[in-house]
Design a protein with these regions (language model features):
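Membrane-interface interhelical loops and short amphipathic "cap" helices
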Residues: 28-70, 93-98, 117-137, 161, ...
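Loop-to-transmembrane helix boundary motifs in multi-pass membrane proteins
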Residues: 100-110, 162-183
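Long, K/E/R/D-enriched contiguous segments that form extended
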Residues: 122-177
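Hydrophobic cores of alpha-helical transmembrane segments in multi-pass inner/ER membrane proteins
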Residues: 76-84, 140-153, 211-218
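Transmembrane-helix bundle segments that line or gate the permeation/cavity pathway
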Residues: 1, 16-38, 84
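Single conserved hydrophobic/aromatic residue that forms the stacking wall/gate
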Residues: 1-7, 11
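Hydrophobic transmembrane-helix microenvironments that flank and shape a buried ionizable site
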Residues: 6, 69-71, 147-150, 206, ...
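Short helix-boundary/re-entrant hairpin motifs in multi-pass inner-membrane proteins
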Residues: 9-19, 26, 56-120, 149, ...
Length: 218
């Protein structure tokens, strides 16, 4: 029986890494073959000295699919240990058991499973089949549910707790606020219609840094 959120989340992180990193490795090998062996996995055409070579059939979008199939679970590979540490620190410094511990554990299981079917929300403007966008928008909104559950449970753990505002606790509170802001911006970017005009803007940069950059570092 795992009674530590940190231990539970680190374990699930290893499972995610086990399934996510092979996609990155395969895409790197295929790209190496394109460069050295003149295969055509990702490159649709090749021009040398102004002449089109007999070279075709590759798809740059295939590389994006492989990269983001790794890339989105990798966000949680980075964030899950932070989730577990924050849960344990909040419980300790609020002098309360973590609210809904079993739900927190199952929320991480749900996040881990869903993280493998949301990758193409990074690719709404890449040229992929637009009908796929609506499927991935739906799964992206669904993954927000267990993520929000963790935030609610952190807040409910603090509710009426004997809170000690030590330095670790202040960092945890900063994590919650930062991650909450990052998650709310993600709701906009997960929607196909809203994401298209926001692509390549600082809105995306802010979302990335609040979720992936600042929050886990805190």
């Amino acid at each position: 029986l795992i009674t530590s959120s940190a231990a539970s989340d680190v374990y699930k992180r290893q499972v995610l890494a086990l399934f996510a990193f092979p996609a990155l490795f395969v895409s790197a090998v295929m790209m190496l073959f394109d460069k050295l062996l003149m295969t055509s996995f990702f490159m649709p055409a090749l021009v040398e000295f102004g002449e089109n070579l007999s070279y075709g059939g590759g798809s740059p979008i295939l590389f994006q699919h492989l990269f983001w199939f790794f890339g989105h679970p990798e966000v949680y590979i980075v964030a899950l240990p932070a989730f577990g540490i924050v849960s344990d620190l909040i419980s300790i410094h609020a002098r309360k058991n973590i609210f809904g511990f079993r739900m927190m554990v199952w929320a991480i299981v749900g996040i881990g499973a869903l993280s493998f079917i949301v990758w193409a929300h990074h690719m709404y403007v890449s040229g992929m089949n637009p009908y796929f966008g609506f499927f991935f928008a739906t799964t992206t909104l669904i993954i927000a549910v267990p993520t929000a559950l963790k935030v609610y449970n952190w807040i409910l753990t603090l509710w009426k707790g004997n809170i000690h505002l030590t330095i670790p606790m202040l960092f945890c509170l900063g994590f919650i606020v930062t991650f909450l802001n990052g998650g709310l911006t993600g709701l906009f970017l997960g929607n196909v219609i809203v994401d298209v005009p926001l692509s390549d803007t600082y809105f995306v940069v802010a979302h990335f840094h609040m979720v992936m950059g600042i929050a886990p570092v805190l």
